[in-house]
């Protein structure tokens, strides 16, 4: 059948209802203000150039009251969302966002805190208040909770901008958690309160950008076989969620055979890429991960991963606290290969390639222990006298000597020969102490050290 053309104002939900599985819909240029869409199996949604699917409504009818402008009569707000927020960002529990000319304002909890770039919701009469003149400007309030959701199989969303949905934390504006085989191709997903995209089993997110979402760029759990490839994932966690809880660029959990490759993951307020809780058979390959607040790539309480041919630069912008954050962090995980990556530790920011063991109980494959890992053929550059590489333990320092983790053929560039850039078993070590160190008959540390003046080009040795 021919594609169904949808102009502005036509109901997308009605078109889904009135057409069979496998139908194709083309959303014409302009802003389609609709959401809560449950497609049928195999349906395809393609955006014409300039097509936007928005969860926001336009606010007109502002009334000036002294130094502020009030817009009464707003719909009942969503219940406050869940999730941990950082201190001072508690207003992020509210799901609605207000935008002026496409710029997100910060919500405050008291009218007295109003000022440029801020807005307040007065629950007494359901009014939004701002401290800047809205005359001649586009003011929008996000009201709809999700764009696409449901159990459809083999859905395709392509060339579409999806923005300004009032999603809670851990829910994507494109929420494919219950679906199978969703394909999200060359889409821009931005300015949503929770996650931009949540993937399910067999999903493919390819191309496009997932930017400036409130909690997380791309998330998912139970997303076996999902692929995230060639996506710009940037400046997420705009609402101020606690990144140690869950916030930042990409986080996938409890999934097998996930591939995260060739993405540019940068300037997120949290980790760049995070695999957590029984991630098995994960491939992190050829990503450029830079200037995220916490760890660059983190594989936590999981097994069987390959981290190769990535560029990781100046992650850990919040500073350093022991071995956290790091460019690459292997936390209570086993059988991980960290190979042929370019790693750069910025001045005052983060660490290099780090393994950590602490008591984390058992998972799908037994005790969660940091063992049987290989760190080989990486280039690690330190821009100052700080930052660590190696193996840190909490409570049981003997694990560093007893468990078979190996470091082979890595090259470390350091500012001078004096600083100590290694930790082993929770104890700082000088380079000379580590050469040829043995465990279970294998060489634990083997490589070379060069001065930073001979730093190579910023590319992985692949």
Give the location of each predicted region.
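Extracellular polysaccharide-degrading/modifying enzymes targeting complex plant/algal/animal polysaccharides
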Residues: 5-177, 183, 418-419, 428-462
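Charged, alpha-helical scaffolding/interaction elements associated with membrane systems
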Residues: 18-21, 211, 290
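Generic serine detector
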Residues: 11, 29, 54, 91, ...
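Detector for repetitive beta-architecture
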Residues: 22-24, 29, 42, 50, ...
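Acidic, glycine-rich calcium-binding repeat modules characteristic of RTX/beta-roll
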Residues: 33-40, 205-210, 397-398
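Intrinsically disordered, low-complexity terminal/linker regions enriched in Pro/Ser/Gly
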Residues: 181-182, 191, 212
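N-terminal low-complexity, Pro/Thr/Ser-rich intrinsically disordered segments
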Residues: 1-3
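Glycine- and acidic/polar-rich repeat regions and solenoidal domains
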Residues: 36, 163, 167-177, 194-200, ...
